[in-house]
Amino acid sequence: MDALQVVAEPRRRAILRLVWDRELAAGDIAARFDVSFPAVSQHLGVLRDAGFVSVRRHGRTRLYKVDRKALGPLRPMLERMWNEKLDRLVALIEEEA
């Protein structure tokens, strides 16, 4: 799975936002979603395999946190996509005016 496919999934993006500034246990992350723990665990595995989150063990708990360096190469691509969408929005607004 390429990097864009990894971050294209809405729940994975939400997980990245949750662990952007702090470590969270897998159970704490799962508690914030309306899907099963195994489903969230699978998303965490995809993020970990892509290198977007780091995981460390604390006893029996796994703590997850974003690896910002790994997300760095995505930034220019995401900014381009964002700017294209904003340009389209501006064009639509101008057409309506």
Language-model segments: residues:
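Alpha-helical residues within the helix-turn-helix
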Residues: 31, 42, 48-49
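N-terminal helix-turn-helix DNA-binding core of bacterial DNA-binding proteins
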Residues: 2-36, 62-72
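Catalytic cores of transferase enzymes with a strong primary signal for eukaryotic protein kinases
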Residues: 3-8, 55, 83, 92
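Amphipathic alpha-helical dimerization/coiled-coil segments
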Residues: 17, 21, 72-97
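Beta-hairpin "wing" of winged helix-turn-helix
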Residues: 48-59, 65
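Conserved active-site alpha-helix within GNAT-family acetyltransferase domains
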Residues: 44-45, 74
